[in-house]
């Protein structure tokens, strides 16, 4: 073992020298006067954030209630937001699936292709796209609106006449469309299910120009499915295209169009008889259907919009939208009525019919929103106006075979 103390002595000397070297700096720091820095104010708008970018079940802001980007705590109404992540995780591929899982909303499918939505005891007929829309002509929805085009769905329960023009004590359903992204993204989702269900959806988004000032997005899909009901089949085709262009640093122009076709073979029209002629309850197989093999119900929806957004001074923003929605429906349906005999099953009669429906809606919406100072406080203000027009052509025809006797449902093959 070495008894030489030289290494320890050198370490002590080095540490002492380092401490002495830092003392003048410490003394200078303690002796200097505190310096006040100039105040720096940082302001920024929350901006629109797509729910698909968050991969969350929670949306940061909602615009359905006030056209202002408010957090859920700031909205003075009951609001539920169904995000893209939730729709994907639970395979909520149509609006029926979405609203069935929404608090305070009841979905009633009276037949295979006709649905009623209710909230707080009233029918829901206020539907919007990006906050623009008008009340539906009928309280029921024909066909199934697919959710492949939407980033999220916002549901405001209770009256919302301030933003819709016609208040309803039920609810307002706002479909927030997907928008183009600056980065290139692409996805394909393939789904299979019971009764030969097949579904595929492709989604491509990204910059169109080298500078990124023009961006585009295309969503296309196809679905085909059967049912536990005899002879029933539904086929859907969807397409959505949207373009965004930065006209200036503060001006954004958006153009978009969507089309969806939903073609159903052998849809139900009416329901199975509940009672036999002797008053006892019927008991049919789960797959029993009164539909004929020639009946059909085809629905087509066209959805087009042009939107111009201008950022103004002082945190203000102005938005103008022209929106067109057209729903076309063609159907040949077969209804059976009467009370069958319990022993023979006979007693039902035919009621064939044909329907053509065409609904065209136009909406022009313009508003501005921003902050202002009053009484030493900052307030938010929305100013705007909306114009809308709806035209409906509804035709119904009834067949010659009304009242003709039919075979028992246990033998009915369409």
Question: PLM ranges: what are they?
Answer:
Residues 136, 148-151, 162-241, 247-251, ...:
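Outer-membrane beta-barrel translocator/receptor signature
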Residues 107, 116, 132-157, 175-177:
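Short acidic/polar hinge/loop motifs at secondary-structure boundaries
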Residues 118, 128, 185-189, 215-217, ...:
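Residue-level detector of the transmembrane beta-barrel scaffold of outer-membrane proteins
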Residues 223-227, 240-311, 324-359, 402-414:
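Acidic/polar loop-and-plug regions of large Gram-negative outer-membrane beta-barrel proteins
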Residues 209-211, 246-250, 313-315, 369, ...:
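Outer-membrane beta-barrel channels and translocator barrels
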Residues 79, 87, 98-99, 153-158, ...:
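Non-catalytic regulatory/gating segments with a bias toward low-complexity or hydrophobic composition
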Residues 188-192, 218-224, 255-259, 320-324, ...:
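Transmembrane beta-barrel strands of outer-membrane/channel proteins
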Residues 1-90, 96-104:
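N-terminal Sec signal peptide and the immediately downstream disordered periplasmic leader
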